[in-house]
């Protein structure tokens, strides 16, 4: 259904009206060109006969040459994604204040942000848009750098409710590569799903565009859940690629080995 959307920033400056067509669930992609200074803008969106809603708009500086693409589930937030029923409960029903952060990951991300001022952080998850506010609050509450969330439409079918998401992540990563052709990326994920393979695929498809791959290793307690049900391992091997790969169970462990490399990148 086509809607006219009015956009205003927090300074009540009218950014104009745009037309967009939403899908049956009301989701839409809107491409609009406006002159804004880099940073985070509080923007309100409104359509006829509806109350306006507000959201953050992230404007990325043209000078930013490094970006971070990070998984959410079991990379920065403990959800136990390898075990579908636990992941569904943790994502949809667990009180946001009780969601646990992966130890040291916010410190790692903050250090990366300090090393690369203005670097955008893109948070990629197979979680549905319905839990956007919960993930957003988690990022803020646990001290992670703010950034756009790239989620998916809700599909309640059992096989796709909590998907592994390789195709979802590939599509968004490829879109970011196209949107920011002069930017190189640090890819951050975990070994509980298909992130190692997915990120290795991205590195092969875009030679010279991936600075590093970071894989957070699940703890034995996290990784044994699926094995106890299926008899199969729930973790994936370290990716085979020419790109530097850094692994560890916590952000602090990863930072110790990754920091010297990042400093060489800055030279």
Model-derived regions, located:
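Short amphipathic beta-strand segments in non-cytosolic proteins
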Residues: 8-17
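Short, aromatic- and glycine-rich surface loops/edge beta-strands on solvent-exposed regions
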Residues: 37-49
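Edge beta-strands of extracellular beta-sandwich domains
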Residues: 51-60
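Short, small-residue-biased leader/transition segments that mark boundaries at the very start
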Residues: 2-7
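C-terminal cap/substrate-recognition subdomain and adjoining C-terminal extension
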Residues: 127-267
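Glycine-centered loop-to-beta-strand initiation motif
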Residues: 16-34
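Asp-based phosphoryl-transfer active-site loop
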Residues: 67-81
């Amino acid at each position: 259904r086509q809607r006219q959307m009015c956009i205003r920033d927090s300074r009540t400056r009218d950014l104009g009206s745009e037309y967009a067509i939403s899908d049956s669930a009301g989701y839409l992609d809107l491409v609009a060109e406006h002159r804004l200074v880099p940073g985070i803008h509080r923007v309100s969106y409104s359509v006829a006969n509806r109350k306006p809603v507000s959201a953050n708009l992230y404007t990325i500086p043209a000078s930013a040459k490094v970006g971070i693409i990070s998984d959410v589930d079991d990379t920065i937030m403990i959800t136990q994604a390898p075990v579908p029923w636990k992941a569904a409960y943790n994502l949809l029903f667990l009180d946001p204040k009780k969601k646990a952060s992966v130890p040291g990951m916010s410190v790692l991300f903050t250090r990366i942000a300090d090393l690369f001022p203005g670097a955008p952080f893109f948070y990629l998850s197979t979680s549905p848009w319905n839990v956007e506010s919960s993930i957003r609050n988690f990022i803020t509450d646990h001290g992670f750098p703010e950034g756009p969330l790239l989620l998916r439409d809700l599909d309640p079918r059992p096989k796709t409710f909590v998907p592994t998401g390789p195709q979802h992540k590939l599509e968004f990563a490829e879109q970011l590569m196209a949107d920011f052709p002069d930017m190189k990326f640090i890819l951050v994920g975990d070994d509980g799903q298909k992130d190692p393979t997915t990120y290795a695929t991205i590195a092969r498809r875009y030679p010279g565009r991936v600075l590093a791959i970071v894989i957070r290793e699940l703890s034995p307690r996290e990784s044994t859940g699926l094995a106890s049900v299926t008899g199969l391992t729930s973790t994936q091997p370290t990716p085979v690629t020419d790109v530097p790969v850094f692994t560890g169970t916590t952000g602090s462990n990863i930072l110790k080995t990754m920091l010297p490399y990042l400093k060489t990148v800055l030279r």
